Amino acid sequence: TAFAAGEMGKPCGDASSFLESERGTALLAVSDGMGTGEKAAAESKAAIELLEQFAVAGFSRELAVQLINSALLLRRAEENYATLDICSVDLYDGQAEFIKLGAVASFICRGNRVISVYAHSLPAGILEQVRVEKNDMRLKDGDLILLLTDGITDAFGGERQTAQWLEEKFLPQGFANPQDAADFILQAAQEHCQKEPDDRTVQAARFWKKIA
């Protein structure tokens, strides 16, 4: 994971997590709190910590999302909300499930092409009931999953422009190490940004088929 705060001297308003369960599931998650600074950081951190607790307790991802939404709603007087971007990967069969609440597109880098994963939903903490949109995909050997916050995609001009940049500029680099990949994308976003920067987070994870 690589991240940068939008405002100098203030905490990054994004939060992220990577968990691997004994049940053979890897969970990646990124949350973007409203605005920047300490308030945004508190919102995104709360969402991620709740997700981690529910995941460890064995709750379904759909129920966890509903409970996180309810928790943020209890603080609605303070106009708190946060995006939630979740990817769960079954490490036995490579099945990946993406769940998004207000989050920008995720990307799967596969060989020389980029697959975009979209969803149209509001962030957590706005409506009493959230519509959980799921996208299921079967991963292939060597796939790289990228979860980003809008500070990254906005720097490149949008989600489609980000996908194009990934294909043209990122894939030719041939990064095997996910951390190197995340660092490269973050640095490039900082160089491309033409307006006041937002908090920026890149979470990268690569999955290989286990050799028997």
Please provide the spans of the model-predicted regions.
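N-terminal entry segment of metal-dependent catalytic domains or homologous docking segments
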Residues: 1-33, 39, 46-49, 132-135
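Acidic loop->beta-strand submotif enriched in PP2C/PPM serine/threonine phosphatases
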Residues: 9-24, 81-84, 116-157, 193, ...
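Short, well-ordered beta-strand elements
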Residues: 27-31, 145, 203-205
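DG-centered beta-turn motif at the end of beta-strands
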Residues: 32, 103, 148-151, 199
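Active-site-proximal, acidic helix/loop segment immediately C-terminal to a metal-coordinating Asp/Glu
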Residues: 35-57, 139, 143-193, 211
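Catalytic core of PPM/PP2C metal-dependent serine/threonine phosphatase domains
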Residues: 41-111, 189-205
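PP2C/PPM-type serine/threonine phosphatase catalytic core
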Residues: 97-141, 147, 162-171, 175, ...
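Short beta-strand-to-coil "C-cap" segments at the C-terminal boundary of structured domains/repeats
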Residues: 205-211
